[in-house]
């Protein structure tokens, strides 16, 4: 499991508190579906995903992105227990949804890009390293039931 120092935890928590979590989640999920189109197969019920514009404007993508972001918020509040925080979601994604765990890493990387775009110069290389470490921890926790 990934270990974040007190300084890294502070950076992650502080940066997450500066963004509109719902907007960041919606943009990250939308970008995931555009950049990695094979991930769309898990969202058949979302309607029109035929183009970047359709995806980014899709209300179901935005709503699910909000859920994803709220889940990230839960993880940020529990950085010392990511495995426990994501145990039920890991089970759901593994046993029922059959999501390839690599998709969690992809989403984490896209989230880092969205954070960088949103925060600009405030998202320093040091802050990025801390945030990248956090999303890796979340992805690892979500993939736990796959092992």
From Swiss-Prot:
Keyword rRNA processing: no
Modification sites for Phosphoserine: 45
Family: Belongs to the globin family.
N-acetylvaline carried by residues: 2
GO molecular function terms attached to this record: haptoglobin binding; heme binding; hemoglobin alpha binding; metal ion binding; organic acid binding; oxygen binding; oxygen carrier activity; peroxidase activity
Function: Involved in oxygen transport from the lung to the various peripheral tissues.
GO biological process, one term: hydrogen peroxide catabolic process
Gene: HBB
Keyword Oxidoreductase (UniProt): no
InterPro entries listed in its UniProt record: Globin, Globin-like_sf, Globin/Proto, Hemoglobin_b, Hemoglobin_oxygen_transport
Protein species of origin: Scapanus orarius
Keywords from the UniProt entry: Acetylation, Heme, Iron, Metal-binding, Oxygen transport, Phosphoprotein, S-nitrosylation, Transport
Binding site residues for heme b: 64, 93
Domain of life: Eukaryota
Subunit structure: Heterotetramer of two alpha chains and two beta chains.
Tissue: Red blood cells.
Modified residues (Phosphothreonine): 13
GO CC annotation terms, alphabetical: blood microparticle; haptoglobin-hemoglobin complex; hemoglobin complex
In-chain residues carrying the UniProt-annotated modification N6-acetyllysine: 60, 83, 145
Modification S-nitrosocysteine, positions: 94
Protein name, per record: Hemoglobin subunit beta
């Amino acid at each position: 499991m990934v270990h974040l120092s007190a300084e890294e935890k502070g950076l992650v928590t502080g940066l997450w508190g500066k963004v509109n979590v719902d907007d960041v989640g919606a943009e990250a999920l939308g970008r995931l579906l555009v950049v990695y189109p094979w991930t769309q197969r898990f969202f058949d019920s979302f309607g029109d995903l035929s183009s970047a514009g359709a995806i980014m404007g899709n209300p179901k993508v935005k709503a699910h992105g909000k859920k994803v972001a709220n889940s990230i918020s839960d993880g940020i509040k529990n950085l010392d227990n990511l495995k426990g925080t994501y145990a039920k979601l890991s089970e759901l994604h593994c046993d029922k949804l059959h999501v390839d765990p690599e998709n969690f890493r992809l989403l984490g990387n896209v989230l880092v890009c969205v954070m960088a775009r949103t925060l600009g110069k405030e998202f320093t290389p040091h802050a990025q390293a801390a945030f990248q470490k956090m999303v890796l921890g979340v992805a690892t926790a979500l993939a736990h039931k796959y092992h």
